[in-house]
Amino acid sequence: CKDYAQMSEKAARIFAAQLILKPNSVLGLATGSTPEGMYAALVEKYNEGKIDFADVTSFNLDEYYQLPAENDQSYDYFMKKHLFNHVNIENYNLPNGMVEDVEAECKAYEERIEAAGGIDIQVLGIGKNGHIGFNEPDSVFIKNTHLVELTPSTIEANSRFFASEEEVPKKAVSMGIGTILKSKKIVLLASGEGKAEAIAKTVYGDIDPMVPATALQLHNDVIVILDEAAASQLKPEDYLSLIHISEPT
């Protein structure tokens, strides 16, 4: 794609097609600046009467630990601001980072996803260090939803949303790599030069838990949607084949 706007519109079309083909779809959603444009485009399509969220169930990738939902930096707040408050979705789920028994919450979250029939389509952004969800570089891939310690680079990247770095939560509850890979279809979005290296490692690198997104190579239905800057470290022929794959039919 040429730019962020084009990337967002393309991603929104893929999600809209999913909802039209299967109105009771189970969506896997992400937060952060990358999918914001996609959500805005979906709200627009909803307002035009093209899509309906009445029978949709959604599960978010992650939520900060010990940050109340009403805090304007919580992912619950983000989702309401950018999507949930603007469409007719009733059955949405986020991990609860305020519970005392985190392990039980993680297990319950996995069970809720399974009970809903699994995720039909999952949107992902990617961190500069290759993280997806809050699955940070590690010596092993963590399979299921879990409590994660955020790395200094992630805390620094997220500090732009907080008054100071000290205020950024140091932990989060996140779907595991195994949870993400169980999704039937995955849409990976990346925009900007800052993501180019992570994308190149994801596409060309060995599968390595130090670059969590490389696990996506194990999935048989991943659509990668990039703007030109994020694709700048890919070989032209690979970028063109990715563009071809991600063209909405």
Task: Please place each PLM-identified region on the residue numbering.
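Glycine-rich beta-strand-to-loop/alpha-helix junction loops that act as flexible
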Residues: L29-T34, L124-K128, S191
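Glycine-rich anion-binding loop/nest that anchors nucleotide
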Residues: V123-G125, V168-K201
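Class I SAM-dependent methyltransferase SAM-binding "motif I" and its flanking Rossmann-like core
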Residues: N129, G133-I177
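Accessory alpha-helical/coil subdomains and C-terminal extensions
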Residues: H146, Y204-L242
